[in-house]
Curated annotation (Swiss-Prot):
Taxonomic lineage: Bacteria, Pseudomonadati, Pseudomonadota, Gammaproteobacteria, Pasteurellales
Subunit structure: Part of the 30S ribosomal subunit. Contacts protein S5. The interaction surface between S4 and S5 is involved in control of translational fidelity.
HAMAP family found in the cross-reference section: Ribosomal_uS4_B
Domain S4 RNA-binding: 96-156
Gene encoding the protein: rpsD
Protein name as annotated: Small ribosomal subunit protein uS4
InterPro entries: Ribosomal_uS4, Ribosomal_uS4_bac-type, Ribosomal_uS4_CS, Ribosomal_uS4_N, S4_RNA-bd, S4_RNA-bd_sf
Amino acid sequence: MARYLGPKLKLSRREGTDLFLKSGVRAIDSKCKIDTAPGQHGARKPRLSDYGSQLREKQKVRRIYGILERQFRNYYKEANRLKGNTGENLLVLLEGRLDNVVYRMGFAATRAEARQLVSHKAIVVNGRVVNIPSFQVSVDDVVAIREKSKKQARIKASLELAEQKEKPTWLEVDSAKMEGVFKRVPERSDLSADINEHLIVELYSK
């Protein structure tokens, strides 16, 4: 399955919530009717079955992190192998992706932009260039903008935008140096309450 290249707001409308696929310069509800699904019959909200609700939640989380189905299923399998709560393990694995950490640190306005920075070798981890978006960042890893990429206008703009947002407590960021430290593994209380990971576990457990 190819990566989705269509209108980003359409996906947020489909899920009925902001998937943070746009930069956030303007509130998403000023751009579209977030509570109305796209299409001719978008105003109608059909009652979902249990399976439908589970599928929608999986699609929502998959789209938030920009991950294809096969890769998402592999993350679930890994989360299920780990000790502890499978749903929480899944979210921790997704949060530990390098492209997500770059986004969370404010070096990119969206996860898609962060993925591009990583792929274009603009990111270093512990002083070494890493160009794999799915690379798992570990505790105490230092993630930084590569020296030759620090003058990019979009990175500076993203950092300015990030100053207006609440910073994740599990990361430590030095905006002036354009680097940050992955201080600790995020806890469930640190992450979005709008995600019902238990529905994803129920879906894949069948």
